[in-house]
């Protein structure tokens, strides 16, 4: 039999400041880059309390599964000059921990959001001589690794979804709990906004987005309501959309399954930012960028993301021997081994301390050595 590879055993073992805005993609070196805390989350819109952007900058965000991420990636980072890619930098909470724990580590931090790069740059200023920050979507990882590390690295971390920093900034329009412009762009310089999707997509396209990206069973009904409403007045704010969703979704369904806007907001955000398209390209590129014994860890927060990661990891850990042969051919074994048994979740203690960790699903693999 040719098994997929799983192993729990392997789990042990000239300075210049960038001028904003950057063009995308752009590779920029930040010589002096500090802030405070961070985290990334995909609770699709429920912001705890309204607050200004300034308040958000001062409010701590707790990195999800921080200790476990360090535990999983540490064996790949022990050599002097090892390189880690934080493919979803956010405010830099995970990166700060790795840079602190591994004094010889070099970091490449990726984010499409210029605000995130600014905040992370300030936070990581004490490590300025060891970091490279790159403004790009995470599917730009291959170019970033080629330009900053010669094409291969020792470990990569993805923390998918919208970041807490983005979610808590009311003016970004990610939250359905407060009225704000219908924006939802992770990169404020991008062209497409949620308002444009709502006001320009035809009814069939809207239903597809809601069904595929929000798994919304009332997708067709909601799309019809949107088209009728925008014929009178175009959508401009999140509050207008939430009000429509209360009208479009039948009352019995509104009483179960969470906030009635949750799935629609998730779907619009994914469409605006091409999140799943980017992820489908990013995971194979990340696997390809690892050196032998390099490790990749991915945190997903909803089933659509996790399904993509699970499928890619299953293929990577499968035998390369042609089907039908009774034994594995030499040199045709799996290219990667799994470091987690399925998807790991946050424990009750972490969820109590950081409720936004509740939906996380963590998967990790290691590249087999000797190639």
Curated annotation (Swiss-Prot):
Catalytic activity: cytidine(1402) in 16S rRNA + S-adenosyl-L-methionine = N(4)-methylcytidine(1402) in 16S rRNA + S-adenosyl-L-homocysteine + H(+)
PANTHER family: 12S RRNA N4-METHYLCYTIDINE METHYLTRANSFERASE (PTHR11265:SF0), S-ADENOSYL-METHYLTRANSFERASE MRAW (PTHR11265)
Sequence similarity: Belongs to the methyltransferase superfamily. RsmH family.
Job description of the protein: Specifically methylates the N4 position of cytidine in position 1402 (C1402) of 16S rRNA.
Pfam families registered for this protein in UniProt: Methyltransf_5
Binding residues for S-adenosyl-L-methionine: 92-94, 111, 138, 159, 166
Molecular function terms, GO-annotated: rRNA (cytosine-N4-)-methyltransferase activity
Enzyme Commission number: 2.1.1.199
Originating gene: rsmH
Locations listed in the record: Cytoplasm
Superkingdom, taxonomy of origin: Bacteria
SUPFAM superfamilies: Putative methyltransferase TM0872, insert domain, S-adenosyl-L-methionine-dependent methyltransferases
GO annotation, biological process: rRNA base methylation
One annotated Gene Ontology cellular component of this protein: cytoplasm
Protein's name according to its UniProt entry: Ribosomal RNA small subunit methyltransferase H
Main localization category: cytoplasm
NCBIfam families hit by this protein: 16S rRNA (cytosine(1402)-N(4))-methyltransferase RsmH
Source organism phylogeny: Bacteria, Bacillati, Actinomycetota, Actinomycetes, Mycobacteriales
Keywords: Cytoplasm, Methyltransferase, rRNA processing, S-adenosyl-L-methionine, Transferase
Coiled coil: none
């Amino acid at each position: 039999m040719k098994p997929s590879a799983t192993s729990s055993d392997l789990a042990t073992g000239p300075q210049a400041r960038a001028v904003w805005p950057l063009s995308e993609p752009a590779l920029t070196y930040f010589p002096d880059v500090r802030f405070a805390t961070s985290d990334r989350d995909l609770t699709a819109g429920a912001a705890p309390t309204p607050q200004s952007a300034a308040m958000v900058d001062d409010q701590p965000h707790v990195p999800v599964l921080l200790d476990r991420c360090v535990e999983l990636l540490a064996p790949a980072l022990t050599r002097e000059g090892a390189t880690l890619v934080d493919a979803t930098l956010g405010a830099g909470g995970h990166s700060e921990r790795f840079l602190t724990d591994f004094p010889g580590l070099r970091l490449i931090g990726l984010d499409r959001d210029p605000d995130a790069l600014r905040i992370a740059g300030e936070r990581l200023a004490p490590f300025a001589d060891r970091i490279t920050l790159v403004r790009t979507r995470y599917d730009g990882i291959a170019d970033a690794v080629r330009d900053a590390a010669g094409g291969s690295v020792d470990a990569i971390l993805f923390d998918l979804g919208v970041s807490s920093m983005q979610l808590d900034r009311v003016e970004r329009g990610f939250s359905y709990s407060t009225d704000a412009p219908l924006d939802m762009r992770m990169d404020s310089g991008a062209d497409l906004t949620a308002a444009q999707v709502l006001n320009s997509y035809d009814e069939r396209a809207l239903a597809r987005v809601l069904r595929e990206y929000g798994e919304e069973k009332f997708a067709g009904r909601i799309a019809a309501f949107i088209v009728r409403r925008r014929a009178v007045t175009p959508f401009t704010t999140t509050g207008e959309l939430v009000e429509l969703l209360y009208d479009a979704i039948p009352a019995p369904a509104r009483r179960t399954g969470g906030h009635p806007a949750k799935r629609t907001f998730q779907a619009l955000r994914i469409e605006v930012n091409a999140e799943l398209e980017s992820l489908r390209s990013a995971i194979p590129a990340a696997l390809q960028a690892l050196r032998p014994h390099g490790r990749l860890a991915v945190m997903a927060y909803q089933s659509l993301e996790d399904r993509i990661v699970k499928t890619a990891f299953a293929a990577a850990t499968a035998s390369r021997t042609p089907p039908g042969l009774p034994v594995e051919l030499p040199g045709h074994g799996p290219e990667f081994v799994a470091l987690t048994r399925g998807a790991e979740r946050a424990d009750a203690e972490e969820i109590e301390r950081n409720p936004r960790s509740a939906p996380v699903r963590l998967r990790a693999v290691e590249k087999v050595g000797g190639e």
